[in-house]
Structures are given as C-alpha cells and as structure tokens.
C-alpha cells in the first residue's frame, strides 16, 4: 500500500512541476531518490509518465493518459468531440493558437490546443491550470458563473502574477460585468507578460459555463484591429459549441458571459 501511495504522490508532483528531475521530485515529496526513481519507473511502465530525454538524467512529464482518464470522468470527451471541428475552423480564420479550457477546482484547465502556423506562438501544455482572475479563459468562466460563485471567488486571495494583474475585488467585479455585456474577455499580459488573449464562455444546457474558448497571441503581434476581429470570432465559435451541446449564448445580454484566455509563453520555432 505504501508503494502505491508513494507512486501517487510522485504522479501529483510531476503534474504540478513538469518537466521535473528526480532530485527535485525527491525534495518535493520528501522521499529518498531511490524510492522516487522506483515510483517513476513504475509509472512509466504503466503509461502515466515519460522522460523528455533518454537515460536516468531525463526530466519527467505526464503522458496523455491522465488527461484521457479525466475526460472520461467528467464527460469532456463529448465536449472535445463537439469543440475540435469548431476550433479548427476558428484557427483557420485567425491563424493564431486556439485553446479550450474547462472549469475545475477554482481554476480552468487546458484540455485542447490547436497551434498557429506562425513561427512565434503561444505554447501551453495540456492539463495546465490557469487562474480565474488573471487569464482570459478564467475570466470568461468566472463572468458566466452565478453571483454566488463569483462572490465566493472574490473573497479569496487574488494573487498577482504581473504588474497588470487585477487583484482588487471591486475592479474585478466591474470587469466581469463588462465581459457579460460584450460576450468576451481579454487578457493583456496579466498572467504572463508576453501573452495576450481573447476568450468567450461555452454554456451548457443548464446555462452554466462548461468550458471557455480562447484565441492566444504574443502581445507583440496584437493590434486593436486583430483584437476586435478575434473578439467576434471567438464569441461566435463559443456560441456554436454551446448550441451543439444544447446550451445558450456565451456572454451576451440575456445569456451569460464570455472570457479571457490564459497566458503562456512565446516560442519561436525553426
């Protein structure tokens, strides 16, 4: 039983810190390196983890198996099946990275990503947690939530990630009201300074947000014209997904709100 518990602790820490090496993991879980190494090898054999480089010196990351299991548990496979064709159309119209995220445990979790063809792009790993108050996807979901859920979140600490992160509850209330009115949220370097995004909430049959859809762009490439175009595109795409799921309109007056996408980091590809 202890070996199973150790393996689960290691799995949790890899998910939180990936990519991560054995020494850092051992310090984090307060276990001997030999114990951590055995757990890693067991999890690799079971298909839960993989190494980013060959040999024991490689750093460890999750495979897609935990994400797939989570989708089965929460019904996200159905959401993804509906969303991906819409995301592909959206990416084709804007040629920027498109993210799909779902609310979970006071955050939003990235479950799908379609990348732009442009050499500088936003890269976030699947399974990444994004804060509700400092990401476009998060704000989209939060603005579409019930007043009670919003107030519950606003009573908690709102961590500052960059100089532009909104950490004042009253200021965030005002922004959420604006998101509901216009149907989309924006993020201009509030989680990562080099990332901007525009997002809208996807509403399920109950009228509650089941996901958020975002267009993510390096801040250096964002213009007022592209922001306006992205806002209309992502709002329309989120509404298409919501309608296919039997839900309503994401964030327009009379519905609920749109959101704002999470930050990441820019990467230049060859």
Residue ranges, per PLM feature:
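Amphipathic alpha-helical effector-binding/dimerization core
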Residues: 55, 61-156
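Short, low-complexity Ser/Thr-rich regulatory SLiMs
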Residues: 51-53, 102, 203-204
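N-terminal helix-turn-helix
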Residues: 1-81, 243-247, 268
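Amphipathic alpha-helical regulatory segments at dimerization interfaces
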Residues: 82-93, 175, 182, 240-244
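Cysteine/selenocysteine-centered motifs that mediate thiol-based redox chemistry or coordinate metal-sulfur cofactors
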Residues: 149-160, 235-270
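Short, structured helix-loop boundary elements
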Residues: 1-4, 59, 63, 76, ...
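Extended hydrophobic
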Residues: 168-238
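Short, solvent-exposed recognition segments
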Residues: 119-193, 266-267
């Amino acid at each position: 039983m202890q070996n199973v518990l150790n393996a689960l602790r290691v799995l949790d820490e890899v998910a939180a810190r990936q990519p991560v090496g054995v020494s850092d993991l051992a310090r984090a879980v307060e276990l001997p390196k030999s114990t951590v190494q055995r757990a890693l090898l067991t999890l690799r054999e079971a298909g839960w983890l993989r190494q980013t480089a060959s040999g024991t010196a490689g750093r460890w990351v999750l495979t897609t198996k935990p994400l797939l299991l989570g989708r089965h548990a929460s019904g996200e496979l159905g959401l993804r099946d509906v969303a991906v064709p819409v995301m592909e159309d959206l990416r084709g119209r804007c040629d920027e990275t498109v993210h799909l995220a779902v609310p979970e445990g006071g955050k939003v979790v990235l479950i799908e990503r379609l990348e732009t063809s442009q050499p500088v792009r936003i890269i976030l790993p699947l399974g990444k947690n994004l804060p509700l108050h400092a990401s476009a996807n998060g704000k989209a979901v939060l603005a579409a939530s019930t007043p009670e859920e919003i107030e519950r979140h606003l009573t908690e600490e709102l961590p500052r990630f960059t100089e532009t992160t909104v950490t004042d509850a009253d200021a965030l209330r005002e922004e959420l009201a604006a998101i509901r009115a216009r149907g989309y949220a924006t993020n201009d370097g509030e989680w990562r300074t080099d990332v901007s995004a525009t997002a809208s909430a996807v509403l399920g049959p109950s009228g509650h947000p089941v996901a958020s859809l975002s267009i993510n762009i390096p801040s250096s490439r964002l213009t007022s014209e592209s922001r306006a175009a992205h806002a209309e595109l992502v709002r329309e795409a989120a509404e298409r997904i919501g309608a296919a799921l039997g839900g309503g309109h994401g964030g327009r007056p009379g519905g609920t709100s749109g959101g704002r996408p999470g930050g990441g980091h820019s990467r230049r590809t060859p």
